[in-house]
């Protein structure tokens, strides 16, 4: 019998579980203050639901053996959009939903096998409005989310913003047979692959210019306007940045416009964004989101209000960035209730109930304690930092 978890899966220890719960609890309280209501879609969905917008590859889905094609959700958005278009179809728009749960994704390992990527996510979806104010609302909520989960200040946070339609405009001058190849080069910032790309030299230099363009929104927008002139996508981004950039700056978050960002997330159509944190090794993407109007259209029976935008935060990744000094538990006292005679067990249970009523964690010794060594060992075993004796 194999005693290890499946490849890619992992066991979380009590401290990791506690921190996950604390982060998710803080986020859920914030979402509710913003008027979002909890929804809990199933972990198992039909494959046509999970692959509806083409944003998720069939190879990334962990399949379920059944009479119909089913799989574990690799992300939560598609399931919520399906629910919004069916069970909540008659509800007035916009719909504001939040969710928290586990998603599963398949990755191919080096040896050709399958690795299961299991992640705990928390996020929101705003469905049924196309206003730019909806995008501003979501980005503002994401910025405020960082404040409530209290990431260690030693980590630098960067909010990257892009637009898939802007990317399409940039790529429109290239041969359609080269588009996917160029997207991959842009996504990977692969300068080596760019040198071997079969395009004219001026086109190669243009791609390199776009790859190097990410930076301060005002500067990037000016560069784009010099190339394309007045454009609705550029104008909307300019309007968005006038509000979001000052809000982010107040929280110590750098905002950058990345024209290549749309290459990374196929689920989105329109605004895309990701929140990246510095770390001790490589940058870590802790949240991502964007517009997914095309996904809503796939599920909707009506052509009206087919709009959606949302984001998800990786609680597992955030957990590693939260300052341990700011991990605020309700009560960090843990009491061992001890007794020397079995006849005092009833009194010990009554004392435990009283401590629980006060919100104090307490455990009872299962045996009478006779010596100091026994007592100290039990304190250590139960990870208690205080003892109460029942005489």
UniProtKB/Swiss-Prot annotation:
InterPro entries: aa-tRNA-synth_II/BPL/LPL (IPR045864), HisRS-like_core (IPR041715), HisRS/HisZ (IPR004516), HisZ (IPR004517). The keyword Cytoplasm applies. Keywords: Amino-acid biosynthesis, Cytoplasm, Histidine biosynthesis. GO terms for biological process: histidyl-tRNA aminoacylation; L-histidine biosynthetic process. It comes from the Bacteria. GO terms for cellular component: cytoplasm. GO terms for molecular function: histidine-tRNA ligase activity. This function is generally fulfilled by the C-terminal part of HisG, which is missing in some bacteria such as this one. This is ATP phosphoribosyltransferase regulatory subunit.
């Amino acid at each position: 019998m194999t005693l290890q978890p499946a490849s890619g899966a992992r066991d979380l220890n009590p401290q990791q579980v506690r921190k996950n719960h604390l982060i998710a609890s803080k986020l859920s309280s914030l979402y509710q203050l913003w008027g979002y209501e909890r929804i809990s879609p199933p972990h198992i969905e039909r494959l046509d639901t999970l692959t509806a917008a083409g944003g998720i590859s069939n190879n990334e889905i962990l399949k379920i053996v059944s009479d119909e094609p089913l799989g574990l959700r690799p992300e939560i958005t598609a399931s919520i959009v399906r629910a919004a278009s069916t069970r909540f179809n008659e509800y007035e728009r916009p719909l504001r939903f939040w969710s928290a749960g586990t998603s599963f994704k398949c990755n191919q390992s080096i040896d050709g096998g399958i690795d299961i990527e299991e992640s705990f996510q928390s996020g929101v979806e705003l469905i049924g409005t196309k206003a730019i104010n909806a995008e501003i609302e979501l980005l503002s909520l994401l910025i405020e989310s960082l404040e409530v989960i209290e990431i260690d200040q030693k980590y630098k946070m960067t909010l990257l913003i892009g637009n898939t339609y802007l990317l399409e405009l940039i790529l429109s001058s290239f041969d359609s047979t080269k588009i996917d190849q160029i997207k991959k080069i842009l996504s990977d910032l692969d300068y080596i692959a760019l040198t071997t790309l079969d395009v004219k030299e001026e086109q190669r230099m243009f791609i390199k210019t776009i790859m190097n363009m990410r930076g301060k929104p005002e500067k990037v927008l000016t560069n784009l306007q010099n190339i394309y002139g007045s454009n609705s996508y550029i104008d909307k981004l300019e309007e968005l940045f006038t509000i979001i950039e000052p809000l982010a700056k107040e929280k110590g978050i750098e905002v950058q416009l990345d024209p290549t960002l749309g290459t990374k997330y196929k689920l989105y159509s329109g605004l895309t964004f990701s929140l990246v944190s510095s770390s001790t090794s490589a940058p870590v993407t802790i949240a991502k989101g964007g517009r997914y109007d095309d996904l809503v259209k796939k599920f909707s029976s009506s052509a009206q209000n087919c709009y959606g935008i949302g984001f998800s935060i990786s609680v597992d990744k955030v957990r590693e960035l939260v300052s341990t000094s700011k991990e605020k538990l309700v009560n960090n006292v843990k009491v061992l209730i001890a007794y020397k005679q079995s006849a005092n067990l009833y009194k010990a249970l009554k004392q435990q109930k009283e401590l629980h009523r006060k919100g104090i964690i307490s455990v009872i010794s299962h045996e009478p304690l006779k010596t100091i060594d026994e007592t100290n060992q039990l304190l250590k075993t139960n990870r208690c930092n205080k003892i109460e004796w029942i005489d």
